């Protein structure tokens, strides 16, 4: 998530855009004391108490196994990566031809690379994609409610080139996938694509000054340049839970949603779950989006949580047709530049996107907006940033209290960490879903699930039967 990394880098460098902020009039020590007093009395929280709470919650979740806590999706687990969206396997002969550029990946990175190469007049290109078509992660992630978290007018590339404006401020997966494939059509990338093909190796041949790229189709293509655009989200992760291979009910990974079993589609209507006891393991970004749909359809839904996500206001809305008609040439690049400037710590006269991501910067700016003759020290700026983060997270925790009726469930859904310690989420239906009588939060308080059995899941020492 480049915007998240940009923000975090921004924090570590003590806000380059605000480096000229000045402290006025009073000596530094007195102003810092005043700011501390304000944070406890006026902001309504105790920073020391929150720091202690954050440490306590962090320590519950420290693990010694690192990435070993996940299973590799191969062997007995390879079914979790089977593509449910490919109707038939494409048959073709192995390729051994030479091209100028091979692009690995058919998501937005690969599409952008292929399109720009085409615009530059590079005709001999090859795009290799293991999915059934262009779209990258959006080819796989078609779970109910899946949508972009960044404003779609910024997130979707080539909107102007395709004379396209998304239907919603945060558009959903079907439109994103369709737009991906429209890009492929616009720039004639389909004629250069090898779908259902996975790169297995690359070797540089010094003698002929070419890369040889081998694939699972027996290809041995050569190219002067190779562009890696496979992205970080190209393979599911499975939790290494004891007994995961013993469960006798139906299972699938959300990135390979089994609509043949659940019924319905990306918009919901999962009628196949009407008589089913369903378990969702994890409360990250995908769960935040799909839980409301499963909650409306399943007989019973148990949501297993190790660490709660921060869930802020989404406020999605349809695109205003009058606004769309008023857009002038260059609008999308200007909007992208404005967004990237703000979330990377820069300054802009106007916040064009004006959402949860850019609000973070506004919060930080408001906490260090002093005027005068003495500059804020890096330590003082860092302190102000921490207070701004505390303030925002207090709002998010208060939102859980406001939207969830049961006090114990609301408390368990409160995140106690800095905002970017876990990917921030935005959704208006997730928290209220826990008010439904058929929805149950199983909070493991950082421990995670104990075991998966033939019948269901053991968490907190109790077995919960599932279908």
Model-derived features: positions:
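Active-site signature of alpha/beta-hydrolase-fold catalytic machinery across serine-
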Residues: 116, 293
């Amino acid at each position: 998530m480049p915007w998240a990394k940009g923000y975090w880098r921004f924090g570590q460098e003590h806000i380059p855009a605000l480096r000229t902020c000045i402290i006025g009039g009073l000596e530094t020590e007195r102003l810092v004391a005043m700011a501390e007093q304000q944070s406890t009395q006026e902001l309504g929280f105790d920073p020391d108490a929150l720091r202690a709470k954050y440490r306590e919650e962090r320590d519950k979740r420290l693990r010694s196994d690192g990435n070993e806590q996940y299973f590799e999706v191969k062997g007995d687990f390879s079914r979790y990566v089977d593509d449910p969206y490919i109707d038939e396997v494409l048959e073709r002969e192995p390729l051994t031809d030479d091209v100028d550029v091979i692009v690995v990946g058919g998501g937005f990175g690969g599409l952008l690379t292929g399109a720009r190469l085409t615009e530059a007049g590079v005709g001999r290109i090859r795009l290799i994609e293991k999915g059934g078509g262009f779209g990258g992660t959006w080819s796989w992630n078609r779970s109910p409610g899946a949508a972009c978290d960044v404003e779609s007018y910024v997130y979707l590339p080539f909107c102007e080139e395709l004379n396209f404006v998304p239907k919603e401020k945060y558009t959903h997966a079907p439109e994103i996938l369709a737009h991906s494939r429209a890009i492929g059509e616009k720039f004639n990338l389909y004629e250069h694509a090898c779908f259902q093909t996975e790169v297995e190796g690359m070797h540089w041949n010094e003698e002929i000054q070419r890369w040889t790229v081998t694939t699972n189709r027996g290809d041995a293509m050569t190219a002067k340049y190779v562009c890696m655009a496979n992205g970080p989200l190209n393979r599911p992760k499975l939790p290494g839970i004891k007994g995961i291979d013993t469960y006798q009910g139906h299972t699938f990974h959300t990135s390979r949603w089994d609509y043949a079993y659940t019924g319905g589609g990306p918009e919901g209507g999962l009628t196949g779950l009407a008589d089913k006891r369903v378990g969702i393991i994890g409360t990250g970004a995908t769960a935040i989006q799909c839980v409301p749909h499963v909650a409306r359809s399943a007989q019973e839904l148990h949501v297993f949580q190790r660490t709660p996500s921060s869930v802020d206001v989404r406020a999605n809305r349809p695109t205003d047709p009058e606004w769309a008609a008023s857009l002038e040439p260059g609008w999308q690049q200007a909007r992208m530049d404005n967004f990237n400037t703000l979330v990377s710590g820069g300054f802009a006269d106007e916040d064009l996107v004006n959402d949860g991501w850019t609000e973070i910067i506004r919060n930080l700016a408001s906490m260090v907006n002093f005027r005068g003759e003495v500059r804020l020290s890096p330590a003082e700026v860092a302190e102000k940033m921490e207070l701004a983060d505390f303030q925002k997270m207090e709002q998010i925790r208060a939102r859980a209290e406001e939207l969830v009726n049961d006090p114990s469930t609301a408390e368990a859904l409160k995140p106690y960490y800095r905002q970017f310690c876990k990917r921030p989420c935005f959704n208006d239906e997730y928290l209220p879903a826990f008010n439904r009588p058929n929805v149950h939060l199983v909070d493991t308080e950082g421990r995670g699930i104990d075991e998966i059995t033939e019948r269901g899941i053991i968490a907190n020492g109790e077995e919960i039967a599932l279908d």
